[in-house]
Design a protein with these regions (language model features):
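Hydrophobic core of transmembrane alpha-helices in multi-pass small-molecule transporters
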Residues: 15, 96-114, 224
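Cytoplasmic membrane-interface "Motif A"-like loop-to-helix N-cap segments
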Residues: 66-80
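Cytoplasmic helix-loop-helix junction between adjacent transmembrane helices
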Residues: 104-147
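Juxtamembrane intracellular "pre-TM" segments in multi-pass secondary transporters
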Residues: 1-7, 186-220
Length: 231
């Protein structure tokens, strides 16, 4: 029960941090379109975010398995926060450009590719098995709230104080989430080093698993199709 209580604290802090990150992402879209008036610029932002995320996600599972999950999460979050801090500095000095935002989105996509699998494994290790269903519901609830409210909050704050105000909120939410993870959360580690000599070896094993477990493969293909054609 103690671990579950600590997870609740982690969940709250991570949810607030996720809200800050989502607000920043939406505010950057507003800023870019306001400055350029180009839908193409917004499309390039998405491209810069998703391409690194997709490419790195292919290999990152092996990396996460062979390193401490807490360290991976802390480093990934710190790099993302540093990128936000740089965007804030550029914004405050009036030197921010669309090019800076493209680079920021690439960094954000990269850090997310590392943070998400490490977080998923960490949650499974610190939460009692009988509470995993609760955790799944809590995560879905918070993620949906972020999706619904982050654009509205970002638009309000963007109108009130511009991009710097949203970036400041994002950085404060990072400090809270980072502190909780660093000082309050202990993640039991089981580091796997012996199975794979390279990321490609791990990918090969993954494809072999999907070949044998066709049910899981069909579910993945179905979900991919649904996400590709959301309407």
């Amino acid at each position: 029960m103690e671990n579950f209580k600590r997870y609740i604290v982690l969940w709250v802090s991570q949810s607030i941090s996720q809200l800050g990150s989502s607000m920043t992402a939406f505010a950057l879209i507003l800023w870019t379109y306001e400055q350029t008036g180009s839908a193409l610029s917004v499309s390039i932002m998405s491209f810069c975010n998703y391409v690194p995320y997709i490419l790195i996600s292919i290999f990152v599972g092996v990396f996460v398995d062979s390193h401490r999950k807490k360290a991976v999460m802390l480093v990934a979050d710190s790099i993302a926060a540093l990128a936000s801090l740089l965007i804030l500095a550029f914004s405050m000095t009036g030197t921010l450009s669309a090019g800076h935002i493209y680079i920021f989105n690439a960094v954000a996509g990269t850090t997310t590719a590392f943070q998400q699998p490490a977080s998923s494994v960490a949650i499974a290790k610190i939460v009692p098995k009988d509470k995993l269903t609760n955790v799944s519901g809590m995560n879905s609830f918070s993620s949906n709230l972020v999706v619904v409210f982050s654009p509205m909050l970002a638009a309000v704050l963007f109108s009130a104080g511009g991009l710097p105000l949203i970036l400041l909120f994002d950085l404060l939410s990072f400090v809270a989430a980072f502190s909780v993870l660093l000082f309050l959360i202990h993640i039991p580690e089981q580091i796997i080093r012996e199975k794979f000599t390279s990321p490609f070896a791990g990918i090969k094993v993954g494809f072999h698993f999907l070949k044998n477990e066709t049910g899981i493969l069909y579910i993945m293909l179905t979900m991919a199709t649904i996400n590709f054609f959301p309407d």
